[in-house]
């Protein structure tokens, strides 16, 4: 990631994060990440982004949140909320659809495995180091059209929306920690990585993740 205007800039009212194939500091690709850590951290509310996704296989755009106590507790104990991730359709064995997007809730090892393993329409993971629950849905025209990706964060539950439609609800009654502490926001565009099993389209030169706005309502 760099802070160069080649990779991140505001233009015509949009935040553009651009990934490029180029030789830079010994790396094959460049891109950017922006965050609000130590600048804007908050607890509860509605968090929303309107964006258009980059149109290249191998891109991994994300809009997510991390616990503000990350530096002291570390991950995954600080908690992570993935409001949007896109790109793993290139490795999906069940849904080969460029419109596939997902949201997830990550937290430390939990005693409430049976509760979260049975949330409808979700995928539950227990890696030993962390637990997380992920939900998937599909959208139309992810590269041509803007869509809104939202999280409604309350003391008792997390609700994830795409274009105002609820598709993932995570109860917090038994697992409020670490989601009862302030979090900060991040937006980034990765290239390859485990999300795509390292795959990047051979003809890739550059792609842009275009963000119209990010809003927090409290």
Predicted regions and their residues:
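GH16 jelly-roll
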Residues: 1-218
């Amino acid at each position: 990631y760099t802070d160069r205007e080649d990779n991140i800039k505001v233009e015509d009212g949009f935040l553009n994060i651009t990934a490029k194939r180029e030789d830079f500091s010994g790396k094959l690709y460049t891109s950017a990440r922006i965050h609000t850590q130590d600048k804007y951290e908050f607890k509860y509310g509605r968090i929303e982004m309107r964006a258009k996704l980059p149109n290249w296989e191998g891109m991994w755009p994300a809009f997510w949140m991390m616990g503000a106590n990350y530096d002291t507790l570390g991950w995954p104990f600080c908690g992570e909320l993935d409001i949007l991730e896109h790109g793993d359709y290139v490795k999906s064995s069940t849904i080969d659809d460029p419109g596939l997007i997902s949201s997830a809730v990550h937290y430390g090892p939990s005693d409430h495995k049976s509760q979260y393993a049975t949330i409808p329409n979700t995928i539950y993971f227990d890696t030993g180091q962390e637990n997380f629950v992920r939900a998937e849905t599909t959208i139309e025209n992810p590269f041509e059209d803007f869509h809104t990706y939202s999280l409604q964060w309350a003391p008792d539950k997390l609700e994830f929306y795409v274009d105002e439609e609820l598709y993932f609800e995570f109860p917090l009654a038994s697992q409020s920690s670490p989601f009862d502490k302030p979090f900060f926001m991040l937006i980034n565009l990765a290239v390859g990585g485990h999300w795509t099993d390292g795959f990047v389209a051979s003809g890739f030169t550059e792609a842009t993740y275009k963000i119209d706005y990010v809003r927090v309502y409290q």
